[in-house]
């Protein structure tokens, strides 16, 4: 037990450490001010989703079996929640401090976020008139009583809450929804570089709204609702699956609250009353000095857009030197494998390839998996055009992609209307693979182009996330990709492969086999190595095998952006394991697996993290890299990430993350890759 507890970290606590690293970017004064605002907003939205999904799941687990223990640290759901809450409170205090600091810094750029204590009588008169004309007609106040029950509070919406006293001394509760798309949230005070949030204005005018009452106390609140809902267990086979998902989204919006945030401290009795109405335990109440929703910072950024020193230097995805974009893309791939590295290189060659496939008379079919797609998608447009041109287009649209369900439902309708065959996913599994197969038949000869990536088919995120995309004409890979699509078409999963690693049946076991091979090399006194780049590591079976490898003398380097449940550097257990996390301008999203030392390396890129959900409960695909140049490129990229001493944090044997101690020349790996992409593009153009 003691050994396990010191080697493994609880998943939820590890995630909070990741979000702390996001908060550190907001705290970092070397980051441009407007970008710091972005990181603060990301920290907040990350925490929202954490409560909606992870804390919601823990609360559900307590209802099912309060003694249930997670398999790594043996913590019960209650123990996990008891550990989460003080950590969140601690991080939120840091968020409050850095927010105040950033607001002070904005004053130097003529942006003042004010309240009614900081304005003149003239400005107050303007705001009163503005409120009466623009806001008051649109709000819907409620007083809780016998004829008016406590209203349903929407997820992540802001409400003004007031304790009202009648003339005979009785207390009532008044509630006003503050969210309304018809009025601006960030209100400019004319003739001044000052702004006020609409919810603060509504809160100030609560006495005007509830005339005839004495306002004893008032605050802004925001509710976070559970979003952890199991689609598969609730599905009725008599229903159309797409219609079922539409209803499920509606149901999710009405799940139980898991958190309440307050903008002002309130009397304990009032908080207890709100908790009673919401059926929420008091421990899930959090007080914050920052606005309850930081999304308004993007409006501030728009105002300051011309002050370029407040933003990261502009970066544009560059032309890849591997492609001549004036020539047919598919013909170039047939000659040699190609790799695109986003966001450093442009997605254009892939988009052009799909458009070529839609128009090419020799293309007979296109098969593709879609998980998260842009709201305005050239990819979808090409697939629709291909179907309209008479090609066999089969698309698996994963309707269970969390928080993207509505977008995917709409795209699935459009694809179907165009004549595409649309598959909605699999029972019991999410299809998370990034797989595209194009089949051509020319003069009786069949050829294939297969694209396998680490990230979504999404033009927007390809500029914001680091991802990799392999395009190959390799027949062995194409035939196994075809097997994956055939299985998906029949509602099944692939059981065996020779080249691809395909979860849920033949990824985890093959990874473990490759770790075993490195253990054998180490035990024979030969150099042995494992390098892993991914978002998260939680799969206990793989982690236990990595511990065995470390004990055997295998050198293991891991670049893991988010959750890492394996603690490195523990004497006698994980001495040979190094873990780094990179949190920077772009979201690290690529997955790279490296097994073996120089001359015998096996290198893969994949859609899968080593999380139990990815290895056992999703359809994921990892592709081997057979092209020597691409293999070396990926290894060099991995080495560069390991050398990052600017945006990287190194995990120590206590599970804490610190800036690497080396005194080498500062290296920001993301900036390095972008400079490299610019140089490569210049060489192509010269």
Can you annotate each of these PLM segments?
Residues 555-559:
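Hydrophobic alpha/beta core scaffold segments
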